[in-house]
Amino acid sequence: MSKRKIKEEMLQVIAPEIYGPPKKEEQDYKPRKLKRVKKKKKDDDDDELDDEVELLHATAPRRRVQWKGRRVRRVLRPGTTVVFTPGERSTRTYKRVYDEVYGDEDLLEQANERLGEFAYGKRHKDMLALPLDEGNPTPSLKPVTLQQVLPTLAPSEEKRGLKRESGDLAPTVQLMVPKRQRLEDVLEKMTVEPGLEPEVRVRPIKQVAPGLGVQTVDVQIPTTSSTSIATATEGMETQTSPVASAVADAAVQAAAAAASKTSTEVQTDPWMFRVSAPRRPRRSRKYGTASALLPEYALHPSIAPTPGYRGYTYRPRRRATTRRRTTTGTRRRRRRRQPVLAPISVRRVAREGGRTLVLPTARYHPSIV
């Protein structure tokens, strides 16, 4: 043990290193007391001057954004007489009664050009719409109308000024009719049956610009033309079989006997026969649905194939590699033993429609009940 350690132990017994709280030093100076200065009362003359003029802000508060109001062009209201009379104030502008406004012959032209009574209020924005795609994916049809923009916002949302994502883009609708039919026959003689549902076909997206595409949706509305009705009625009138003629003669005799007993009436309107359009027989499919067919696939060698299903076990082909010949001249072929696959128990499950499925029996872990 060194002498330094012995001295430290002796000092620890005599004067242990335990320190008490520090002593506060006595303040030799007295704290300074602050005196509040009383404001002198202003004279009465100064109060009178202050009451007359009071400047709250020397300069107007500046806005963060330099904003300017819209420039308004003064438009003289129609019907106002411009007369200058010295010493008299100009009267309030006169506005016509709307009964008089509605009587104008060029009312629509005034509203379109924003003239007269239509020259006030918010200026409407001229909407300029450009079609992104004018191609026709159905060559057998011809367009009748232009591409009209469909409103995507409700009227209440437009008034509130709501904006949605991609608000600059809007869908369009266009009416198309068959090329081989005349336009008058299609628009005038065709009737739409409300009970039939239209056939909808969604076409793939066509790219018109980088990052921008157009998707066409074909809605085929089933219609019944009056030409089919006319041909059907003509066919009924020109039937000349002997059975029909005998029935017609009997009907004529019965009508003549009834006419002799009752008053004779003349029919001026032609008879209307409601004949349904002939339905085309639905083509029978030669093949089953594509979802019911399983593709040909290869299984991993570790997977045992299930009987009743397609698929085969993948066997990698041996690559043609050059081997060194042994000096003895004898070759040994190394055959890879194929793993012995255990047979799989299979169960057949009957489904609706007389279909049977071959499913493998599942094997559970011993811990699963």
Swiss-Prot record:
The modification Phosphoserine is found at residue 166. Residues 22-31 have a biased composition (Basic and acidic residues). Disulfide bonds: none annotated. Induction: Expressed in the late phase of the viral replicative cycle. GO terms for molecular function: DNA binding. Residues 32-41, 315-338 have a biased composition (Basic residues). GO terms for cellular component: host cell nucleolus; host cell nucleus; virion component. InterPro entries: Adeno_V (IPR005608). GO terms for biological process: viral release from host cell. Residues 15-50, 307-342 are annotated as: Disordered. It holds the Pfam family Adeno_PV. Keywords: DNA-binding, Host nucleus, Late protein, Phosphoprotein, Viral capsid assembly, Viral release from host cell, Virion. It is found in: Virion; Host nucleus, Host nucleolus. The modification Phosphothreonine is found at residue 85. Transmembrane segments: none annotated. All late proteins expressed from the major late promoter are produced by alternative splicing and alternative polyadenylation of the same gene giving rise to non-overlapping ORFs. A leader sequence is present in the N-terminus of all these mRNAs and is recognized by the viral shutoff protein to provide expression although conventional translation via ribosome scanning from the cap has been shut off in the host cell. HAMAP family: ADV_CORE5. Associates loosely with the viral DNA to form an outer shell around the nucleoprotein-DNA complex and links it with the capsid by binding the endosome lysis protein. Dissociates from the viral genome during entry. Might be involved in nuclear capsid assembly of the viral particles through its association with NPM1/nucleophosmin. Monomer. Homodimer. Exists in equilibrium between monomers and dimers in solution. Interacts with the histone-like nucleoprotein; this interactions bridge the virus core to the capsid. Interacts with core protein X; this interactions bridge the virus core to the capsid. Interacts with the endosome lysis protein VI; this interactions bridge the virus core to the capsid. Interacts with the peripentonal hexons. Interacts with host NPM1; this interaction might play a role in virus assembly. Belongs to the adenoviridae core-capsid bridging protein family. This is Core-capsid bridging protein. It comes from Human adenovirus C serotype 2 (HAdV-2). The gene is L2.
